[in-house]
Amino acid sequence: MSFIEKLKNAWVSNNSLLCIGLDPDTEKFPDLFKTMAKPEAVFAFNKAIIDATHDLVCAYKPQIAYFSAEAAETSLEQTIAYIKTQYPHIPVILDAKRGDIGSTAQKYAAEAFERYQADAVTVNPYLGLDSITPFTAYRERGTILLCRTSNSGAADLQDLSVDGIPLYQKVAITARDHWNSHNNCLLVVGATWPEQMAAIRQLVGDMPFLVPGVGAQGGDVNAMVKAGKTADGNGLIISSSRAVLYASNGDDFAQAARAVALSLRQQINVARA
C-alpha cells in the first residue's frame, strides 16, 4: 500500500487529521526514565506515547535530529519498526528536511526509505528537481516538500517575489507541475499562516499538506483547518509535538498525552465539520 493510500485510510479509520511529532528530548522526560541509558529511554518513552495515542492519529512524525543528538539512531529504527509491527495502518513520516545534490540525495532517500523504512520524508526543495527526484523515485513513498514553513523567519526568503509571485507559491506551482509525476508529493504549510495556506490550496488542489505549528507554536486550529482542508474535509496532516509529548512530566505522562491528543483531534474535527 502506498503512503498516500495509507494516509487516506488513516484519516477515515481514526477519524483524525492529527499527527503526533515524536521529538524525544530526554531532559524533559519524567523521572522514571532517568535511570535508563538515553537510547533505551528514548524508545521506551516513544513506545508509551504511541501505545496511548495510536487510535487518535493519522500519522507519527519522528524528527531525526532528536535521535541523532542523543546517539539514538537505533531507537529511531526501533520506534518505526514498533509502529509498523503493532499499528501498521498508521503511516510514519521521517522529519529530516534533507536537501543536497543528486548523488547525496540518493543516499538520504535510501536512509529514509530503506534504513528507517519510513513511509514519507520531509525534503528541502531549494536545490531543485535533481535533489528531489531520488526521493520521488520511491513511488510508494511520500516526498513532503517545504513550502511555507511555520517559523517566524519564514518570510525572509519564502515571501520574496519570483516571477511576480511569492517564492512559496512558486514552490507550490513547481511541485504541482513538475515534481509530482508519481502523485507522491506533499507540501509543508505552517498552521501559523492560514491566509497563505488558503492561497496554496487554491494552487495545488487536493495535494495533502503537512501542517506544523499547532500547539506550542500557537497556530489557530479553526482558521488553519478552514483554510487548508480539501472538499471532503481531509487533506491535512496536522502535527503537534511538544504540547502532546510533554503534557505532564509525571508518571501519568502517557495518559496526559492522550488527553491532549484527544482534545486536539476534537478541535480539528469540529473545525472541519
UniProtKB/Swiss-Prot annotation:
Q: What is its EC number?
A: 4.1.1.23
- Which UniProt keywords are listed? Decarboxylase, Lyase, Pyrimidine biosynthesis
Query: Which first-to-last residue range defines the signal peptide?
Result: none
Q: Which InterPro entries match?
A: Aldolase_TIM, OMPdecase_AS, OMPdecase_type-2, OMPdeCOase_dom, RibuloseP-bd_barrel
Q: List the GO molecular function terms.
A: orotidine-5'-phosphate decarboxylase activity
Q: In which pathway does it act?
A: Pyrimidine metabolism; UMP biosynthesis via de novo pathway; UMP from orotate: step 2/2
Q: Which reaction does it catalyse?
A: orotidine 5'-phosphate + H(+) = UMP + CO2
- Spell out the SUPFAM superfamilies in the cross-references: Ribulose-phoshate binding barrel
Q: What class of enzyme is it?
A: lyase
Q: Name the active site residues.
A: K97
Q: Which GO terms describe its biological process?
A: 'de novo' pyrimidine nucleobase biosynthetic process; 'de novo' UMP biosynthetic process
Top-rank taxon of the source lineage equals Bacteria
The text of the family note is: Belongs to the OMP decarboxylase family. Type 2 subfamily.
Q: What is this protein called?
A: Orotidine 5'-phosphate decarboxylase
Give the species.
Answer: Cellvibrio japonicus (strain Ueda107)
